[in-house]
Curated annotation (Swiss-Prot):
Expressed in colon, heart, kidney, leukocyte, liver, lung, ovary, pancreas, placenta, prostate, skeletal muscle, small intestine and spleen. This is Protein naked cuticle homolog 1. It comes from Homo sapiens (Human). SUPFAM superfamilies: EF-hand. Residues 192-205, 271-281 have a biased composition (Polar residues).
């Protein structure tokens, strides 16, 4: 039956029956078939069929009486008993008979490109116009489902195909009722206002009743949660990692700034952090190109260690006091290159380790950034003797604990005063370079802050604890 109705040429095909010749005419093609049949019957002459049909009016519910009147006029009484005309009509409750059937025939003859499965003719035979109440709508909102904030057309297409397959497999198909399923997808990157919504109307999906439609909705919600679950896990892990990273960075920056304020040295690296080499290992490292003595920046820290940790003191931190002769000679070779550039800061050969002349060098090097190897470098012990930012932190800690060392340092200074004043060959260069750091460590920890600040501003005014003579 479906093949007959899909071809217009087979509408008025003759067929033999025991009762005589008859015609099978569809309601959609009744006008064209009746006109052709009337034209063939009245071929010798007379009024043509279309004119008579125009006078009769449109084809409606009275199609059978109209065809009967035409046949009574054209056929004789004998022929009228032999011929019968059968017209296949749809149910009378359908409104808009001709237009609806024509749309149905066109839909069957031309397959829809969007539908995946071919529909049979029987399913659309009693189809009616779509009502607004029969539509069902699902809305999916995915927040940053690819973790980079960029959504391409391929992602939307693949996502819509997946949603379509899930909805199609979960909805019951019924030939009695038809509903339009509207799938609305909204992709919003992290709650921003830019949204891309795609509206897909699937008219060929059939659903039974609203009771059976709640199950696919729950399935789709669970599917959406499964899609978003790994993304939420990845986002939480990223947040935890980034928080730890920021915390570590802040802690390292605060620690580095604290040591920069204490020592007054630029590009100063922390040695209290985990995994850092010991102080004795860092003393053997080669010097940097910009400042040969900058690599020995652990010496001020070795002096700070007894103040900060008086109970558990590392014996390697006192390497400046217990340095062997081989290390002192190596230190002398390193400092020999900077001796020529720092001659104009020293007044006499005996006063090379004098804290007064070196204090200006440390002050200039601290206030101005290092320009290159041409600027003379000073030992970190001179930085300790000259930096006023270091003294307020040393005085409150060392004033109480190391108060008894002031008298010992005075006796040591007076004892060493005579050989240095005479300039005899008793003390060599190695001991001469080693003594200022030792005396600076003992004297600065015990003396008040006011005397050293006074000493820095008035370099010609000498106190009793200085063992150099001018």
């Amino acid at each position: 039956m479906g093949k007959l109705h899909s071809k217009p040429a087979a509408v008025c095909k003759r067929r033999e029956s025991p009762e005589g010749d008859s015609f099978a005419v569809s309601a959609a093609w009744a006008r064209k078939g009746i006109e052709e049949w009337i034209g063939r019957q009245r071929c010798p002459g007379g009024v043509s069929g279309p004119r008579q049909l125009r006078l009769a009016g449109t084809i409606g519910r009275s199609t059978r009486e109209l065809v009967g009147d035409v046949l009574r006029d054209t056929l004789s009484e004998e022929e009228e008993d032999d011929f019968r005309l059968e017209v296949a009509l749809p149910p009378e409750k359908t409104d808009g008979l001709g237009s609806g059937d024509e749309k149905k025939m066109e839909r069957v003859s031309e397959p829809c490109p969007g539908s995946k499965k071919q529909l049979k003719f029987e399913e659309l035979q009693c189809d009616v116009s779509m009502e607004e109440d029969s539509r069902q709508e699902w809305t999916f909102t995915l927040y940053d489902f690819d973790n980079n904030g960029k959504v391409t057309r391929e992602d939307i297409t693949s996502l819509l195909h997946t949603i379509y397959e899930v909805v199609d497999s979960s909805v019951n198909h019924s030939p009695t009722s038809s509903k339009m399923l509207r799938v609305k997808l909204t992709v919003a990157p992290d709650g921003s206002q830019s949204k891309r919504s795609v509206l897909v109307n699937q008219a060929d999906l059939q659903s039974a009743r609203p009771r059976a439609e709640t199950k696919p909705t729950e399935d789709l919600r669970s599917w959406e949660k499964k899609q978003r679950a790994p993304l939420r896990f990845q986002g939480d892990s990223r947040l935890e990692q980034s928080g730890c990273y920021h915390h570590c960075v802040d802690e390292n920056i605060e620690r580095r700034n604290h040591y920069l304020d204490l020592a007054g040295i630029e590009n100063y690296t922390s040695q209290f952090g985990p995994g850092s080499p010991s102080v004795a290992q860092k003393s053997e490292l080669p010097p940097r190109t910009s400042n040969p003595t900058r690599s020995r920046s652990h010496e001020p820290e070795a002096i700070h260690i007894p103040h900060r940790k008086p109970q558990g003191v590392d014996p390697a931190s006192f390497h400046f006091l217990d340095t062997p002769i081989a290390k002192v000679s190596e230190l002398q070779q390193r400092l020999r290159g900077t001796q020529d550039g720092s001659k104009h800061f020293v007044r006499s050969p005996k006063a090379q380790g004098k804290s007064v002349g070196v204090g200006h060098v440390a002050r200039g090097a601290r206030n101005k950034p290092p320009l290159g190897p041409a600027i003379p470098a000073v030992s970190p012990s001179a930085h300790l003797a000259a930096s006023p930012a270091l003294l307020p932190s040393l005085a409150p800690l060392g004033h109480k604990k190391h108060k008894h060392r002031a008298k010992e340092s005075q006796q040591g200074c007076r004892g060493l005063q005579a050989p240095l004043a005479s300039g005899g060959p008793v003390l060599g260069r190695e001991h001469l370079r080693e003594l200022p750091a030792l005396v600076v460590y003992e004297s600065q920890a015990g003396q008040p802050v006011q005397r050293h600040e006074h000493h820095h501003h008035h370099e010609h005014h000498h106190h009793y604890h200085h063992f150099y003579q001018t």
